[in-house]
Amino acid sequence: EIMPSLVGSEMCIRDRLDMVECLIGPDIRLIHYQGIYKPAYTGGEVRWHQDNDYFKVAENRTISVWLALDDVTVENGCMWYLPGHHHQLLEHEQLWSTSEKKGFYLAIPEIDDTRALPAEIKSGGFAIHHCLMPHRSLKNETARPRRGLAMHFMDAKMPDPDMLSILPEDATPVLRRRAPQPGVAGSSLPSQHLKDRV
């Protein structure tokens, strides 16, 4: 019950929605949110992946907002981004999380990550990335946990991806629907907006 109330709170979401609107337009739907927890000295690696290999939203019109609940550093497993690889969906492989095959994750099998950049964030800060931006995180090597909240938003005008068919209707609400504001792009893909910045 804590997660939905936090995600829906004005404190947590209003300014982020303004930024999301600049990237995917004024019709915004929350399609997924999750608490992220890397325990001290463990909290293993999350391999390189692109979010839209999970979501499969049409025209790649999805943005992720990662809110830091603790200071996030290289030492405690911050996210790393790979500039220049966000123009297309790369091939992923499905890997099992446990030997019992009770859960799986997706990972890019081979990618040159020599240009990867860490995203260190102060508590209360956030990172925004496009659904085709490759990212990963490494193990927490510190004595403190690393906690965050990930929120994933899609253009509400896009067809529902298959993943939404198994969820209750109110699980993925439209959070904003309004006429475009002056100066808000919204008509171009996020990868085009950010082409010269990443």
In which residue ranges do the predicted regions lie?
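Conserved double-stranded beta-helix
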Residues: 16-81
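Non-heme Fe(II)/2-oxoglutarate
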Residues: 94, 126-128, 132-198
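Short, surface-exposed loop/helix-turn segments at secondary-structure junctions
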Residues: 50, 99-115, 145, 163-170
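Feature marks short, surface-exposed loop/turn motifs that line or immediately flank catalytic pockets
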Residues: 37-39, 73, 88, 155-157, ...
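Double-stranded beta-helix
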Residues: 72-134
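Single conserved hydrophobic/aromatic residue that forms the stacking wall/gate
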Residues: 1-8, 12-13
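Glycine-rich, charged/polar anion/phosphate-binding loops
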Residues: 50-53, 66-67, 113-115, 133-136
